[in-house]
Amino acid sequence: MARDKQYRDNAQKFDRDRLHSDEEAIGIIKSLGMKKFDETVDIVVRLGVDPRKADQMIRGTVALLAGTGKDVRVAVFAQGEAATAAREAGAEFVGADDLAAEIEGGMTDFDVAIATPDMMPTVGKLGRVLGPRSLMPNPKTGTVTPDVVKAINEFKGGMVEYRTDRFANVHVPIGKASFGEDALLTNLRALVGELERVKPAASKGKYVKKLSLIHISEPT
């Protein structure tokens, strides 16, 4: 099958048992056969932290200067002037109780949820829906803020969230397969630099243990 042949061809382009520099890894990713759509390139960073401990949980946002290549859809919980400003800034979904009702009904057709502080009592009731999808607004990621316009512009312009999973991995998209090597490298280094910046004081031993680049072979 053509898919099996492409897999074999790609597997011959690098040594799985050898560690590569970031430049080499980006070059390998760029050399792999592409699908008919523009695949997402993800980075998985294994960190030397214990995510079971509160003082070693890592969560935040980082600006990918080369962008993500994705059309980010934003939902904003706001009222009055803040809601008007959010619509003018290009948010796809804006509302208060009405938006909450839509989400309770199963509407989650957005990538980022932003809320003004006064809307958090309403948003907090949506934890069952938003939490498992990593869409719950949080002050640590800049998604609970009175300045919704700034947040919308940042997330549509390349800001992404990161957090450790239960295995101490951080999994973040850094661009598309169509990006140039310099753009992917810029985004990779921005993320790693941010993770180094927020290294917990309680983390002992080697902090950044392993970086892996992955082609996500599904259209987005």
Regions found by a protein language model. Give the residues of each.
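Residue-level detector of conserved catalytic or cofactor/ligand-binding positions
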Residues: 211-220
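Residue-level signature of catalytic and energy-coupling elements of molecular machines
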Residues: 25, 86, 131, 213
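Long, charge-patterned amphipathic alpha-helical coiled-coil/hairpin "stalk" segments used as oligomerization
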Residues: 91-198
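Flexible, glycine/charged-enriched surface loops at secondary-structure junctions
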Residues: 37-41, 198-210
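Translation machinery proteins
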Residues: 20-84, 105, 111
